[in-house]
Amino acid sequence: RSRGLGDVYKRQLTDMLVNLESDSVLGRFKLAKGSMSLVDTKLQTEISKSVAGLPYSLSLGGSAGNTIRAMAKLGCQVGFIGKVGQDTTGDFFVQALENLGVEPVIFRGSKRSGKCVSLISPDGERTMVTYLGAALELTAAEIDPAIFDGYDCLYIEGYIVQDHDLIRKAARTAKECGLKVAIDLASFNIVAENLEFLRNLVRDYVDIVFANEDEAKTFACEAEPLNALQCISEMCELAVVKIGIKGAMIKHGDEVVHVGILAAAKRVDTTGAGDFYAAGFLAGLCENLSLRQCGTIGAITAGKVIEVVGTTFGEEAWEDISRLVNKVRNEKYLF
């Protein structure tokens, strides 16, 4: 029985997107425009009150949240592991997962739920004020084998690797339960700061590694992406190195595949491109498609999300993606 993807994600954040009429609130709270600040709940509440009455929207936040949402839209059966507070924000997070058809494996913490207030200036630039709260309270002790019952793969977002005990326990438990383990390296500076841990984690437990060019070079200590791909593939079963507008290189055993990008894509906002690429690729793997088919679906989902501001688009776009994915399944549309 295949239920697709289990997802461990420590930083469960609800995004509150607020459209500002001016940048005055940034000056009032001494927020550098375009920055991301970690704050306590008191300051975040004060900022939220100061923009009360302005247009806003709520959505699932975080890198893994993007991936899990896209996979659900692609028809995969998915679950989400994390911790929220005992509050209305936590209730929203759980309900949003259920509305997507995602199984919420959500613990309740003692702190308030994590939230990112994204202040959108009239010129479109975002200034983010983040309170992590209960999202930081998920511990290794809460990772139980029963969480992984019925799943094929655990996907780990690289942004949370600073909690070594949690990630190691999740990966080890998933492997013991017979799951594949996939990780997205997330950011080259995080890779550099956790290099020894990440290399050991990949060697010991990880089957699938996603990385962009900078992350791959940092992880492998190689100057060329092809050499980095080779190095990563020697540590795991399947390596995927994304090289921007040149597409992606994929290596499984002796098989190396280069897949292009969605040619029609307009680069409006690259937020979430890597998250959506992983979603498309893993969705293909869940259907046992070829590496080229998986890479093409990843390129389609990534190509579509960069055509919009943010990571949310309408049903018409998803219908277009579904149409293209069906062509990929029939090998009539490959990059």
Regions inferred by a protein language model and the residue ranges of each:
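A short, aliphatic-rich alpha-helical micro-motif
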Residues: 2, 147-149, 202-203, 233
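Glycine-rich phosphate/adenosyl-contacting loop at the front of the ribokinase-like
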Residues: 3-79, 335
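Substrate-binding N-lobe of the ribokinase-like
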Residues: 43-115, 319-329
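Anion (oxyanion) recognition and catalysis
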Residues: 72, 98, 175-176, 233
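Conserved phosphate-binding/catalytic region of the ribokinase-like
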Residues: 6-7, 12-20, 30-33, 225-335
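Hydrophobic beta-strand scaffold residues
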Residues: 78, 104, 181-182, 239
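Conserved phosphate-binding/catalytic loop of the ribokinase/pfkB sugar-kinase fold
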Residues: 105-108, 118-161
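Conserved phosphate/ATP/ADP-binding segment of small-molecule kinases
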Residues: 171, 177-180, 186-258
